């Protein structure tokens, strides 16, 4: 019990210190999106602690978790070379005590992303699993881990992407509907003239 209290309070102080250490210009411009602003509830923080410290299976995704970790608002330029380093730390995108090897941020509304779950299946980038592809072009950033040091100082290279997002989805019993699970890729449109029909299939114009 004592060990849990010490760990909990230490992590809380650590997260508060991170927010204080953010550059002042970032605090002014993007403060409303911070992962643990004052408006967050105690339940949000406890939920984060359970997931971060857990040694068991990863918790199933939720709508709020997807919105918090994947979706971003306009503000910081998507082409900024430090985009991933800033957003990964700000949104606490880690896997337990490790840096994630890759991650995607999408500039879109959750409802639009959720609709993608009901689009036609297409091959994922690994050619094995089935993915759903968006019907519209989406802007986003692909983050690739280049240096893994002690948390939270994970270093990433940022790549701006504009294309069709590939996602996997999972069924959530509580709300009886499909919700986004993982972002598989952002596929840039081909150079030749093309379009997507209503089924999400590429139709090549002559």
UniProtKB/Swiss-Prot annotation:
Gene3D superfamilies, alphabetized: Ribonuclease A-like domain (3.10.130.10)
Q: What Gene Ontology cellular component terms go with this record?
A: extracellular region
List the keywords (alphabetical).
Disulfide bond, Glycoprotein, Secreted, Signal
> InterPro entries recorded for this chain?
RNaseA, RNaseA-like_dom_sf, RNaseA_domain
Q: Which GO terms describe its molecular function?
A: nucleic acid binding
Q: What does this protein do?
A: Does not exhibit any ribonuclease activity.
Q: What is this protein called?
A: Inactive ribonuclease-like protein 9
Q: Which organism is it from?
A: Saimiri boliviensis boliviensis (Bolivian squirrel monkey)
